[in-house]
Swiss-Prot record:
It is an enzyme of class 1 (oxidoreductase). Keywords: Cell membrane, Disulfide bond, Heme biosynthesis, Iron, Membrane, Metal-binding, Oxidoreductase, Transmembrane, Transmembrane helix. It comes from the Bacteria. Pathway: Porphyrin-containing compound metabolism; heme A biosynthesis; heme A from heme O: step 1/1. Its EC number is 1.17.99.9. It is found in: Cell membrane. This is Heme A synthase. PANTHER family: HEME A SYNTHASE. Catalyzes the conversion of heme O to heme A by two successive hydroxylations of the methyl group at C8. The first hydroxylation forms heme I, the second hydroxylation results in an unstable dihydroxymethyl group, which spontaneously dehydrates, resulting in the formyl group of heme A. Heme o binds at H61, H123. Residues 1-5, 84-90, 143-158, 225-234, 281-301 are cytoplasmic. Heme b binds at H206, H266.
Length: 301
């Protein structure tokens, strides 16, 4: 086991979580234009003078994101040098870097070219994939070459499906924020106003999809229990905990949670949920690949 590398990877993963939360703060406080249309400079300067609150929020997000990007590069290089025999570990280090790079490009584009709400909504989801890649990398480094229980094809397929569907729900949630549709509905869980706007339909659509996500999570947990797969079952129980809290904070936002920390908690919970789900999905893929490899070895033996 590469302990130092594993702990460093864990530190970088926490850094990515901080980047996600700070990005949510930028969106919540409408600070995306806090540095004007300059990037990477802020109002034409390396360090802004007499900054407003919005400028400080946007500038600090850029600084932390830049430091995190350098840490991810260092982690990827260290991983490629130290863990030459593990292709999967190197792949996740590479994915973390690539998605961090894409996220930075979209962030810069939002400042310079004023992207549409539909494009801006991709920003959080891409950052989420980078975080999940770092989390999986960290877990793999701590695990070493440990063997795990094989996951059935049905359970594996539903884990993949749940992961993909989660990304769609995450996108709709980000679109709600960037569209300014957070308070487009009166009441919860159903929009109770007589006149519905486009923003109301977007908000209600996100609620319906989030409700289905909870049901799908329950179903995958049921499958894991039925097949007595303890690792998947424990992981899905943790996922259910986070998604229920996620729905609760969503209702809190609509019903009066106007404080900045409430939507940030909302983003934190879905990040934890997706991180766990991503690892379980890869675990399912990995266990199947090892089973196929063992069968092929027996046939050739």
């Amino acid at each position: 086991m590469h302990k130092k590398l594993a702990f460093f990877s864990g530190f970088v993963t926490l850094g990515m979580m901080l980047v996600l939360i700070m990005g949510g703060t930028v969106t919540k406080t409408d600070s995306g234009d806090g540095c004007g249309t300059d990037w990477p400079l802020c109002h034409g300067k390396l360090i802004p003078t007499n900054p407003s609150v919005e400028t400080m929020i946007e500038y600090s997000h850029r600084v932390v994101s830049g430091i995190e990007g350098l840490l991810i590069i260092a982690l990827a290089i260290w991983t490629f040098i130290a863990v030459k025999h593990r292709v999967d570990v190197k792949i996740f280090a590479f994915l973390a870097f690539i998605f961090m790079l894409i996220q930075s490009i979209i962030g810069a584009g939002a400042v310079i070219w004023q992207q549409s709400d539909a494009i801006l909504a991709l920003h959080f989801g891409i950052s989420l994939v980078s975080f999940a890649s770092l989390l999986i990398l960290t877990i793999l480094l701590f695990e070493g070459d440990r063997e795990h229980q094989v996951v059935s094809r049905r359970l594996r397929s539903h884990l993949y499906g749940l992961s993909i569907y989660t990304m769609i729900v995450v996108y709709t949630g980000a679109y709600v924020r960037h569209l300014g549709a957070t308070y487009a509905c009166v009441g919860w869980p159903i929009c109770e106003q007589e006149v519905w706007t486009f923003e109301s339909y977007v908000q209600m659509g996100h609620r319906v999809m989030a409700g289905l996500l909870v049901l799908y999570t329950l179903y995958v947990l049921y499958l894991a229990r039925k097949e007595m797969n303890r690792l998947i079952e424990r992981g899905m129980m943790a996922s259910l905990f986070f998604i229920l809290l996620q729905v609760g904070t969503g209702a809190w936002i609509v019903l009066g949670g106007h404080a900045t920390y409430v939507p940030l908690l909302h983003a934190f919970l879905i990040t934890c949920y997706f991180g766990i789900l991503s690892y379980l999905s890869y675990h399912a893929y990995r266990s199947t690949a090892r089973q196929d490899g063992a069968q092929l070895k027996n046939m050739n033996g």
